[in-house]
Amino acid sequence: RSPSRGLGDVYKRQEVNRMDFHPKDLKSDEHRSRHPLGRIPVLDDGDIRIYESGAIVEYVLERHKKGNLKPDVSNDNYPEYLQWFHYCEGMVMPPINTIIVQTLLLPEERRDENVLNQARKLLSKSLEPVNQALEGREYLIGNFSAADIMLGHACFMSNRLGCVNEEMLNMKSYVENINKRPAFQIAISMS
C-alpha cells in the first residue's frame, strides 16, 4: 500500500527507496530503523519521518500545498472527501492486507483458505459503497483529490486481486481513470 502512488501529483522531489516485499527485508534491522513494525510506506522529508499512509498524504498536502487536492473545510464536498480519505485505511485495506498475507507472505503450510475467502468477500462488500458513490463521477468527490490518492491505489489492488466484480462498472471505470494518471503510471513502473 503506497500513498506514493498518487503523491507524484503534489510531491515532485521524491526519491524512492525500493525494497523487496519479503518478510526478511521488511523485518531487517535497517528497515525497522525506519519503521518499528517493519512495514511500508515510510516517508523521510529532511529530519521528518512518517510511516502511516494517511498521515503521509496529509503531511505532504499541508507541507507542500501544491494543487487543489483537499477541499476547504467550508466546502460542501469536505465531509464526503473526509469520508473517502479515511475509508481506505478503515474499511478497504484490512481485507487487502489479509489477502496479501494469505497469498504472498505466509508459507503455504500456514495459509488458511477460509480466512482468504472471508477476506475476499469482505473486500468486495467494502467496495460496494465506493462503486455506488462513483455513479456519474470520474473521481470520488467529482474532481481528483487526496481521497483518490488514498483509495485509488486500494481499488487498483482490489481489481488486481480479483475482488472488483463485473457488476461494479463504476469501480472498473474508476480504476481505469486512476491507472491513466501520469503520476500513478510512474509510481507503478517503479514498484
Regions found by a protein language model. Name each.
Residues R1-L7, Y11:
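Single conserved hydrophobic/aromatic residue that forms the stacking wall/gate
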Residues D9, L43, I56, V130, ...:
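Residue-level signal for nonpolar/aromatic packing positions in well-ordered secondary structure
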Residues K12, Y59-R63, M157-L161:
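Active-site catalytic microenvironments for nucleophilic, acid-base chemistry
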Residues R13-L26:
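A short beta-strand-loop structural module common to alpha/beta enzyme folds
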Residues E15, H31-V60:
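Short, structured active-site "lid" loops
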Residues H31, L69-P71, Y139-L140:
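Short clusters of hydrophobic/aromatic residues that line enzyme substrate/ligand-binding pockets
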Residues V57-Y78, W84-H86:
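Helix-adjacent hinge/juxtasegments
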Residues F85-K180:
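GST-like fold's C-terminal all-alpha helical module
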